[in-house]
Amino acid sequence: MAHPNEDLIREGIAAFGRGDMDAVRKQMADDIRWHVPGRGLISGDYEGAEQVMQAFARLAELTGGTYSAELHDVLANDEHAVALYTARAERAGKQLTDNTVLTYHIRDGKVSEVWGLSTDLYAVDEFFS
């Protein structure tokens, strides 16, 4: 039986993949913080659910809706979850394939903070430059 926080993250990533942004939003604490490393157009620290949702909309805009996350695994306990996935996208004739790790902090059944880690940040920065 999976940990409830594993289910939470798996459901969120599946909802993101379906474009069900209402379901994605419902998983977030209102005061969520989301950290995207690098220097590209989507890099930065997003404070609050509204800013995070705007960042997701910007990601879809920049990639023409091609961004996808192929989930490999989720590891979870009572306070954290870690998702391992491969991100893929196309933009301006460029293609991105990047193995990514998201580290989630979970509070009261909601995602309260996320740290993204990329295996090839140079490629991600170039893609989103």
Stretches found by the model and what they are:
Residues Y67-A69, L96-L102:
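Short, surface-exposed coil-to-beta transition loops
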